[in-house]
Amino acid sequence: MDPGRVVFDSGVARRACPGGAQMLLFGGGGSANSGGFFRGVPAAVLGMDESRSSSSAAGAGAKRPFFTTHEELLEEEYYDEQAPEKKRRLTAEQVQMLERSFEEENKLEPERKTELARRLGMAPRQVAVWFQNRRARWKTKQLEHDFDRLKAAYDALAADHHALLSDNDRLRAQVISLTEKLQDKETSPSSATITTAAQEVDQPDEHTEAASTTGFATVDGALAAPPPGHQQPPHKDDLVSSGGTNDDGDGGAAVVVFDVTEGANDRLSCESAYFADAAEAYERDCAGHYALSSEEEDGGAVSDEGCSFDLPDAAAAAAAMFGAAGVVHHDAADDEEAQLGSWTAWFWS
């Protein structure tokens, strides 16, 4: 035996490893003429037959994951035991019953899973897998349905939004155009009015000039010409024209009678005021000095003081109305002439 070789008995390896695991042999190998690692070691010593090597390779390729539950291991063993030709699809009755159960409740409880498996003649794991796949398909369809519904709502809202934007633009354009037209209408009449007024101020028309000329002429004529029915104030010699003297030898006073009834209904003038003042002055002068001579001859009113004067009701009313309306002011010359007339009347009486 070559001292550079190590030979292990395969029987010892089988006894040490009941599962049939093989041990590595260090030393020479192969044939005596070969230069391999196991040079000079026959193949029978290695204890590796082809049948065991093939079965061990198949077992090594189907290694189980580390984190697995007991139920999963049992289910895997169940599926591994069934050959591909032995696996069968679900029948229509089983699918209908599973669908009805899923519609009632999409969550699968352990008791319910066991009951369904017993009634359908299926494995509990197979029922759980079917429910899991059906729930995934239901979620996908639900998402698709929600997506279609939301997309339709979005499209409707987008169409309404575009319609509102177009209406807004159209209404805004109308408002702008109407505002411009309104501003033009408000600006044009005001400018035309201002221009016309300026032209009228700068260039008065013929009617305005004629009216102004006529008005000035009328005012001048009214100031220059006496009013209608105006009479010149009587002269001092004519003051006693309507009166008479009574020389009956009894020392009676002469009576001056003023006839103011004539023209009482006409416009009151300065002469009416003058005669009224003269009558009042005469009444004051003759009061208490002379006695009434003849009531029949005079035909006038008799006062308590013995002075006779003729003032009819119409003249009295005219004098009262004239006093209420206001007396036309005379100038200084007319006042002096009236005073002189009153003194002359008193003197002749």
UniProtKB/Swiss-Prot annotation:
Compositional bias (Low complexity):
188-198
**Tissue expression pattern:** Expressed in seedlings, roots, leaves, nodes, internodes, flowers and embryo.
Show the segment(s) annotated as Disordered.
181-253
Q: Which UniProt keywords apply?
A: Activator, DNA-binding, Homeobox, Nucleus, Transcription, Transcription regulation
Q: Which domain of life is it from?
A: Eukaryota
> Which terms in the GO cellular component ontology are assigned?
nucleus
Q: Which SUPFAM superfamilies match?
A: Homeodomain-like
Q: What ranges does the record give for the region Leucine-zipper, renumbered to this chain? A: 141-185
Q: Which InterPro entries match?
A: HD, HDZip_class_I_plant, Homeobox_CS, Homeodomain-like_sf, HTH_motif, Leu_zip_homeo
Localisation per UniProt entry: Nucleus
The main location class comes to: nucleus
One GO term under biological process is: positive regulation of DNA-templated transcription
Sample GO molecular function, one term: sequence-specific DNA binding
Q: In UniProt terms, what function does this protein have?
A: Probable transcription activator that binds to the DNA sequence 5'-CAAT[AT]ATTG-3'.
Name this protein carries in UniProt:
Homeobox-leucine zipper protein HOX5
Gene that specifies this protein: HOX5
